[in-house]
Amino acid sequence: MECLMAKLVPRLELPLLPNNIPSACHWDSSSLSQELDQWLISKLGITDESAKRKIVQSRVMLLACLMHPNGERDRVLLAGKHLWVYFLVDDILESSSREGYGALKSIVWSIATTGIYKASEEHDHHDLVLLLLVEVMVELRKEMPTSLFARYCKILSIYLDSVQEEVKHQINNTIPSSEEYRLLRRRTGFMEVMACIMTEFCVGINLEELVVNLGEIRELVKIMDDHIVTVNDLLSLRKEYYNGTIYHNWVIVLLAHDCATFQKSVDRVCEMIKQEEDSILDLQKKLIIKAKVDKNPELLKFAFNVPMAVAGHLKWAFITARYHGCDNALLDGELFHGTWIMDPNQTVIVKNM
């Protein structure tokens, strides 16, 4: 591990990432963002101004608006609440001890499937987050079609089991192989829920079970998951570098097993993002053709809308204070590139001349 640490340097060359998947943003994103931010700040009882600013500048509602631009307003708001709550739940799960994870896993599963959680009298941060999860899951269970919610729970079960495996790696200071990491992150990313199921819910797409299991759709789900995870790992690199969770990241996995230098590992991750985007666009075309040939309007809606979640996540990853620090003038909505200096407080980019 010490040898690996010696290869890490707090600066790298970041190329302009490909951004060719069609994208859009929900028409009411500004109002929705204010509504979600106020909801979270109120529910968590946050009074500190810097903490409020971090929530607002994390732009999580904007992520939902970019992922589901054609969704019904109330459902997109619920998707935004769901995103925020799972960011918080994921942080709690990943920071738990091996002994504590089992209990947390059971609580999260119980909340999702029954909507019941008995909080402690103190109502600490964990309790407040889990009570938020109760609120969101009760509403989701009420509004989501039964078959879609059943798919949701199936993927949630896989996610909870897989995060437990991730926690073991963190506790033992072990780094999985590239293929192990790819397969693990497909399960811990929870992106079939965030990108596919939530888009189907927000837009009102009704896929038959036979269509859900089409080879092209299953492959699209895997590659979309890969793209979102790879972008996440690259753009959250500064944050993870300073908070001590950097070992569970594509850049470090490749550095440990496949690449000789930090920069070569970054370059390889950027190549992966390009390859994943190309595959998504190819699969999207195939699904559009199939939908038209089969005269299946629901599949056509799926093919047009679901890949937007990937494009939306890419844009958000460049503008969120969650990765790049608060009050950062760099976050102007454009995909930045150049010499990336991983300052402890925020992302700094020196434009290459």
Curated annotation (Swiss-Prot):
Query: Which residues take part in binding Mg(2+) 1?
Result: D90
What are the record keywords, sorted?
Magnesium, Metal-binding
Q: Does the keyword Cytoplasm apply?
A: no
User: Which Gene3D superfamilies does the UniProt entry name for this protein?
Assistant: Farnesyl Diphosphate Synthase
Q: Where does Mg(2+) 3 bind?
A: N232, S236
Binding of Mg(2+) 2: at which residues?
A: D90
Q: How is the cofactor bound?
A: Binds 3 Mg(2+) or Mn(2+) ions per subunit.
Please give the biological process terms from Gene Ontology that the record holds: isoprenoid biosynthetic process
| Motif DDXXE motif in this chain | 90-94
- Enumerate the cofactors the protein uses: Mg(2+); Mn(2+)
Task: Identify a single GO molecular function assigned to this protein.
Answer: terpene synthase activity
* InterPro entries reported in the protein's UniProt record: Isoprenoid_synthase_dom_sf, Terpene_cyclase-like_2
Magnesium among keywords: yes
UniProt function note:
No terpene synthase activity detected in vitro.
Similarity remark: Belongs to the terpene synthase family.
Q: What is known of its domains?
A: The Asp-Asp-Xaa-Xaa-Asp/Glu (DDXXD/E) motif is important for the catalytic activity, presumably through binding to Mg(2+).
PANTHER family, per database record: BETA-PINACENE SYNTHASE-RELATED, TERPENE SYNTHASE
Miscellaneous field: Selaginella moellendorffii contains two distinct types of functional terpene synthases (TPS) genes, the typical seed plants TPS genes (SmTPSs) and a microbial type TPS genes (SmMTPSLs).
Q: What is this protein called?
A: Microbial Terpene synthase-like protein 30
- Identify the taxonomic lineage of the organism of origin: Eukaryota, Viridiplantae, Streptophyta, Embryophyta, Tracheophyta
